[in-house]
Amino acid sequence: MYGKMKEFLAKELADIKAAGLYKNERIITTPQRADIKVNDGEDVLNFCANNYLGLSDNQRLINAAKEAMDTHGFGMSSVRFICGTQDLHKQLEAAISDYFKTEDTILYAACFDANGGLFEPLFTEEDAIISDALNHASIIDGVRLCKAKRYRYANADMADLERCLQEAQAQRHRIIATDGVFSMDGNVAPLDKICELAEKYDALVMVDESHSAGVVGPTGHGVAEQFNAYGRVDIFTGTLGKAFGGAMGGFTTGKKEIIDMLRQRSRPYLFSNSVAPAIIGASLEMFKMLKESDALHTKLIDNVNYFRDRMLAAGFDIKPTQSAICAVMLYDAKLSQDFAAKMQKEGIYVTGFYYPVVPKGQARIRVQLSAGHEKAHLDKAIAAFIKVGKELGVIK
């Protein structure tokens, strides 16, 4: 029986490779940080991790994780509603609610689960979900699992969003779903205008803060802080796997009744093991650190501005950003692959993105800055970009 399936899969995999879309996994032999070593012994500077605040190898978080294992064990061996809820889980949910100024929080194994398990428990065929065209795959999948009527508006296009809201007026409930920061371009959702339209057309607002929490806003509290939208957003989702330590774990935070219903009906929550105590303990310590100082956020923003200013001065085409994501536009798919390969030879680890990950003709190198980067790291990366850019005719 597997013979036919094997033949089919082999052809599919060959087609993926022929199209240049096969994903190879590079093996890292050090902790995740700005300077890493890969399994061939090569030392490289990492500019493609979501380690925005540089906390992935923070010793204070490592110590907190070890302490949590000593006091609360290695794993939970249960879902939350049976015997998988410890005092640490409730403490972390309270800390997340405090951070986002919300009423309650529910933890998930990943933000993919948070988004995947959000819509189906809350909305039916009587309702409407209005989603940004560039939302993350987890939001798209979550919407697909729900029977609500679906609308999609062009990225951050408020006229198109208003058109969708007008068309959805006959539905019982409406919710606008958007990423806070869009991961390929690094642009920030215009949350103030989204909230204005939501209030005008009686819609709820959901924001995924995965790439924006810890990064965007005067003190890094996300797009809600950036646009002073506290109290206007009904649901936030997010991850502990990016700025907040980089391990794993996701969450949904918002109105109390919404969170309570998710505890009753959200399938990824009901049928997945609780997040491990080590992750919870380290995450609690991380939120304490962010309360004590916003120095890491300040350093991150300084690094972003330093990198962008010098890359623009060198002649590169970079999309506008208010986040830690800098999209260096190359437009040609093969050029983006060649550029990334040459950067690796210069000791800089970046990734080229091209269709179907981004639209045709929009290939780019996505650079992700971190508070873990020092000025010497940035200078080396900029010098490599300039060298490779000249070799490939991207800049003069």
What annotation goes with each model-predicted range?
Residues 10-11, 15-72, 203:
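N-terminal "arm"/small-domain region of PLP-dependent enzymes with the aminotransferase-like
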Residues 51, 151, 155-207:
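Active-site phosphate-binding strand-loop segment of PLP-dependent enzymes
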Residues 59, 63-67, 71, 94, ...:
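PLP-dependent enzyme catalytic core of the Aspartate aminotransferase-like
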Residues 298-307, 312-347, 357, 361-362, ...:
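Conserved PLP-binding catalytic core of the aspartate aminotransferase-like
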